[in-house]
Regions:
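A domain-level signal for the structural core that forms small-molecule/cofactor-binding pockets
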Residues: 28-36, 52-53, 60-66, 137-141, ...
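Generic hydrophobic alpha-helical scaffold/packing signal
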Residues: 49-53, 122, 189-192
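Active-site-adjacent substrate-binding region
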Residues: 78-172, 199
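Conserved small/polar residues in nucleotide/adenosyl-binding loops
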Residues: 210-217
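Acidic/histidine-rich catalytic neighborhood of metal-dependent amide-processing enzymes
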Residues: 6-96, 196-199
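His/Asp/Glu-rich mid-to-C-terminal helical/loop segments that flank catalytic regions of hydrolases
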Residues: 10-26, 164-208
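Short amphipathic alpha-helical face segments that pack within enzyme cores
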Residues: 3-11, 44, 120, 183-187
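Short, conserved micro-motifs enriched in small and acidic residues
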Residues: 1-6, 115, 175-178
């Protein structure tokens, strides 16, 4: 979680977007249920977004339309294939340290990813030149969830669950890759430089204003 919090913040600080309002949200108390005033289950994100909307002179209808047009990256690490316990991993959804950002999917909807949001995120990764891996739990192994779905109870929007591969999650020997840290900063910067918009065909696409500005100059 700290790795994703750090890289997300770095991308947020590096990003520049004059077409959208960039938001970086970092929640506390996930491991004890997220029910605190600073947790993902609180109204904190909803309240902040509503205040921004009000400060811009917008009404409630504008707020709900803005949410529907928004896009969230729910960033929380993923389980890499462990060399001592390879059988714990689904053989068709293996992720490895230092081989790129992970997109997480779950048939039981424990992650926010869907076909549309995954496609949008893959496009952002391609623009950033960052490799992508795909993770899903073994169907007979119970896995956890992330803050994305918890936050969705307050602010419904398009979202994809991503993270970085690591070993020994939640232990005192958590291990992750340094290259993945740089990969995540790159893709986060590209995300915060992009404007996610809906086309006339009701498809979502990411328009990179960094690339547009470079083309214009």
């Amino acid at each position: 979680d700290l790795q994703c919090a750090f890289t997300s913040l770095q991308g947020f600080l590096k990003g520049s977007n004059d077409q959208s309002i960039n938001v970086f949200a970092c929640f506390d108390n996930e491991e004890v249920g997220s029910g605190t005033k600073q947790g993902a289950a609180s109204t904190f994100l909803y309240d902040v977004l509503h205040r921004i909307n009000n400060a811009l002179g917008k009404d409630d209808e504008d707020y709900y339309r803005a949410l529907a047009a928004s896009f969230m990256l729910s960033a929380d690490n993923a389980h890499a294939v462990h060399p001592n316990h390879p059988s714990k991993t689904d053989v068709n959804n293996c992720v490895y340290m230092n081989e790129g950002v992970v997109v997480k999917s779950h048939a039981g909807q424990k992650y926010t990813s869907d076909g549309v949001s995954i496609a949008v995120f893959k496009g952002i990764c391609e623009k950033a030149g960052v490799p992508v891996q795909f993770f899903a739990n073994r169907s007979d192994v119970v896995g956890g969830s992330t803050l994305g779905n918890i936050a969705m109870a307050q602010v419904s929007m398009n979202s994809v669950d991503i993270g970085l591969p690591q070993l020994a999650m939640h232990s005192s020997y958590e291990t992750a890759g340094i290259k993945d840290t740089y990969y995540m900063i790159q893709v986060m910067e590209e995300f915060f430089n992009s404007h996610i918009e809906e086309t006339s065909a009701h498809e979502l696409k990411a328009v990179s204003y960094t690339h547009l500005r470079a083309h214009e100059t």
